[in-house]
Amino acid sequence: MSNLYKIGTETRNKIKKFRTSTARTDSIKALSIKIEPKPSYEIIVDEDEQEELDEIEDLSELAEILPDNSPRFVLTAYPTTTKDGFKQTPLVLVYWKPMTVVSQEWKMLYAGALEMIREECGTFKLIEVSSGLEDDSDVEELREQLENC
């Protein structure tokens, strides 16, 4: 069976490096993953957004960095402290799909690639964000979901 999507070696290596480098991080880290348009449909790390994501200090900054007209996958390392006082940094895949995405093609492409990306990133924790994080309550809801992973 032929696959519509392709993940190159460079992208695989970047995901692997992100996973290992964020295992004990004390700050939020995020890796933006997107699908290239026709004809390749290659899954790549979005370098333009990545520079800004490397500087992120709070979840509310995601809305300013991520596009409001295109979906993304954001592999996120979110450090938390458990009730027992242990520090942990779970990897969570955030499926960014703002309500303003009008292209049915993009919605279908990202929905179809979701399981492939989850498997490649090695996480089964998934949070779908469709609010655009415009309100403080949206950011707080995302924060709670990340802390409960």
Curated annotation (Swiss-Prot):
One of its GO terms (cellular component) is nucleus. Signal peptide: none annotated. The modification Phosphoserine is found at S137. InterPro entries: ADF-H (IPR002108), ADF-H/Gelsolin-like_dom_sf (IPR029006), GMF (IPR011171). The modification N-acetylserine is found at S2. It is found in: Cytoplasm; Nucleus. GO terms for molecular function: actin binding; Arp2/3 complex binding. Present with 3040 molecules/cell in log phase SD medium. This is Protein AIM7.
